[in-house]
Amino acid sequence: MNIFLDVGAHTGETTKAVLTSKYKFDKIYCFEPQRKIINELRQIESDKVIVNNYGLFNIDCKRDVYSKDVTEGGSIYRDKFKKILFTEKCDFVSASKWFAENIKDEDNVTLKINCEGAECDIMDDLFSSGEYKKVKALMIDFDVRKIKSQSHREQEVREKIKTSNIPLVFMLGSEELNKMTKNETARYFRRRERWVHYWLDKLFNK
């Protein structure tokens, strides 16, 4: 089965773009812990889309998620924001546990992670458990680069990914952003659907 995991689904920007792309998936699992924005995600009309109102992390827990406003994507790391106006207690599930219970070895899994700083916690959990071996394609956005207390982890996880033998990898972090052209940067920050199609092409046309 071809499965897409949208970790840090927000209001469904990536999922909507995946549904309009030339790459076809049997199921799209969305993970979004913030109740304040989950309703928009649930309005996506597709039998393929399964919405989970919890985030993936390295343990099962409840944690505060901080954001600048009620529509902003939030982070479990308070120091991502200079000013916090909204805090919500959210549910999280161990990524390795979820993989073990829901993903089969024969599944063809594409994993997208863009979750405002928790990406390194998730990947470390998948690496330590061995569940990362079920991932055939990975797109990871290193938001830890924006968080002083976590920025050192970007390079650590990069090295693990490089030696992991995950077949297809697209990383977006400090290194890539420094090399991007103005057009690519505009595509990333302003045209989310086009950007998703761009990195899907980068992944699957290697």
Indicate residue ranges for each PLM-predicted region:
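Phosphate/nucleotide-binding beta-alpha loop and adjacent structural elements of enzyme active sites
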Residues: 1-206
